[in-house]
Amino acid sequence: CEIPFDILDDLSGKMPKLRQQIMRLMSSEIKSDQEMILLLSKMNAEERLAAFIYNLSQRYSARGFSAREFRLTMTRGDIGNYLGLTVETISR
């Protein structure tokens, strides 16, 4: 579900605990992304793809979904772009 920024900003201004939770979540996401970038820069193609799938698994699990079975909603091209790999490499 999408909440327009102006509405979320207004609500978080009125509810300090909501603002704190949003900041906590954003900080966690930024930290996770930074760690992924560092890891990916040191990995070969196979390791990058494995780390990507593992990261998705952990995120699904944290949200109460199955960590073992989930649908990849990104295309091979999108995954390749995210990981800095070609579509052919992702397809292998």
UniProtKB/Swiss-Prot annotation:
Induction: By anaerobiosis.
Predominant cellular place of this UniProt entry's protein: cytoplasm
Transcription keyword on record: yes
Gene3D superfamilies named in the record: Jelly Rolls
Binding site for [4Fe-4S] cluster: 1
GO cellular component: cytoplasm
Pfam families assigned: Crp (PF00325)
Domain of life where this protein originates: Bacteria
GO term, biological process aspect, one: regulation of DNA-templated transcription
GO function term, MF aspect, one: DNA binding
Cofactor: binding details: Binds 1 [4Fe-4S] cluster per subunit.
Residue ranges occupied by any HTH crp-type domain in the UniProt entry: 43-92
InterPro entries for this protein: HTH_CRP, RmlC-like_jellyroll, WH_DNA-bd_sf
Cellular localization per UniProt: Cytoplasm
Cofactor: [4Fe-4S] cluster
Record's keyword terms, sorted: 4Fe-4S, Activator, Cytoplasm, DNA-binding, Iron, Iron-sulfur, Metal-binding, Transcription, Transcription regulation
Quaternary structure annotation from Swiss-Prot or TrEMBL: Homodimer.
Function of the molecule: It is involved in the activation of genes necessary for anaerobic respiration.
Record's protein name: Anaerobic regulatory protein
The organism of origin for this protein: Aggregatibacter aphrophilus
Gene: fnr
